[in-house]
Amino acid sequence: IVGGNEVTPHAYPWQVGLFIDDMYFCGGSISVTLTGWGKP
Protein backbone atom coordinates (compact mmCIF):
# COMPACT_ATOMS: atom_id res chain seq x y z
CA ILE A 1 0.00 0.00 0.00
CA VAL A 2 1.48 3.34 -1.08
CA GLY A 3 -0.35 6.57 -0.29
CA GLY A 4 -3.35 4.55 0.87
CA ASN A 5 -3.67 2.72 -2.46
CA GLU A 6 -2.95 -0.96 -3.09
CA VAL A 7 -0.16 -1.45 -5.64
CA THR A 8 1.16 -4.33 -7.74
CA PRO A 9 3.67 -6.52 -5.86
CA HIS A 10 7.29 -5.51 -6.61
CA ALA A 11 6.17 -2.18 -8.15
CA TYR A 12 8.27 -0.28 -5.57
CA PRO A 13 11.40 -2.44 -5.03
CA TRP A 14 13.02 0.14 -2.73
CA GLN A 15 10.30 -0.33 -0.09
CA VAL A 16 11.25 -2.74 2.68
CA GLY A 17 9.48 -4.43 5.58
CA LEU A 18 11.18 -5.65 8.73
CA PHE A 19 9.79 -8.85 10.24
CA ILE A 20 10.80 -10.29 13.60
CA ASP A 21 9.62 -13.80 14.51
CA ASP A 22 7.25 -13.74 11.50
CA MET A 23 5.57 -10.55 12.76
CA TYR A 24 5.67 -7.20 10.94
CA PHE A 25 7.82 -4.76 12.93
CA CYS A 26 8.25 -1.66 10.75
CA GLY A 27 8.88 -0.49 7.18
CA GLY A 28 11.21 1.83 5.36
CA SER A 29 12.90 2.52 2.07
CA ILE A 30 16.32 1.96 0.56
CA SER A 31 17.99 5.06 -0.86
CA VAL A 32 21.30 5.91 -2.48
CA THR A 33 22.82 9.16 -3.66
CA LEU A 34 23.20 9.12 -7.44
CA THR A 35 25.40 11.26 -9.65
CA GLY A 36 25.33 11.60 -13.40
CA TRP A 37 22.96 9.18 -15.14
CA GLY A 38 22.10 6.88 -12.26
CA LYS A 39 25.64 5.86 -11.38
CA PRO A 40 26.32 5.59 -7.61
UniProtKB/Swiss-Prot annotation:
- Could you list this entry's UniProt keywords, alphabetically sorted: Disulfide bond, Fibrinolytic toxin, Hemostasis impairing toxin, Hydrolase, Protease, Secreted, Serine protease, Toxin
Specify the Peptidase S1 domain's residue ranges. Answer: 1-40
Which EC class heads this enzyme's classification? hydrolase
Q: Which organism is it from?
A: Euphausia superba (Antarctic krill)
What's the stated role of this polypeptide?
Serine protease with fibrinolytic activity.
Give the highest taxon in the source lineage.
Answer: Eukaryota
UniProt subcellular location: Secreted, Extracellular space
**InterPro entries on file:** Peptidase_S1_PA, Peptidase_S1_PA_chymotrypsin, Trypsin_dom
One GO cellular component, as annotated = extracellular region
- GO aspect biological process, one term: proteolysis
Name listed for the protein in its UniProt record: Fibrinolytic protease
Query: Pfam families this protein is in?
Result: Trypsin
